[in-house]
Amino acid sequence: EMCIRDRAIELGLDVVKFFPAEQSGGLAKIKAMAAPYVNMKFMPTGGVNAKNLTSYLDFPKIIACGGSWMVPGDLINAGEWDKIEQLTREAVQTMLGFELAHVGVNAENEEEAVKAANRFAFIFGMPAKVGNSSVFAGSALEVMKTPYLGKNGHIAVKTNYIERAVNYLSTVLGVEFNEESAKRDAKGNLKAIYLKEEIGGFAVHLVQK
């Protein structure tokens, strides 16, 4: 086992397939192997399915997962490509886990933002929290202190893996992103980014869960 990984490094590989993943100890085994090999990433296959997919992908050393649950043999033999496509799309959606995070409202100034957020918070029994550039009412409504992106405001969509979401939306669906809007943490990890387009007068941004 150690020799195989050392051999992979000697060959200049920094990504290796781990198969059969579940039968070989699953995520715990990968974490144990990853500890001494800081630059090695893994692609587990074998026993990976819709239920355990995100538990694997949550580990930063997992670059991708594979699984035959998306392409069952009986559907291949029957030529039911539409069903295979559906299963694959469902796997992608399970991975990305898109959900509404909050709605953003543009206010003219801080006073108006506080007033609007406080009123919303009062009516619906939510806490109001003043931030640097906006005021939140609970987690559902964000009122901007100055007009920002979006004619009508913005809609935030949260995702399990924002980097993977950006890659999927841009390469597969052709969605364009406003790179200047990207926000990153101290380690350089992407935390939020806006789409270039507005939808229904709303700017849209992704946010990391």
Regions found by a protein language model. Name each.
Residues N109-F124, A165-L173:
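Amphipathic alpha-helical segments
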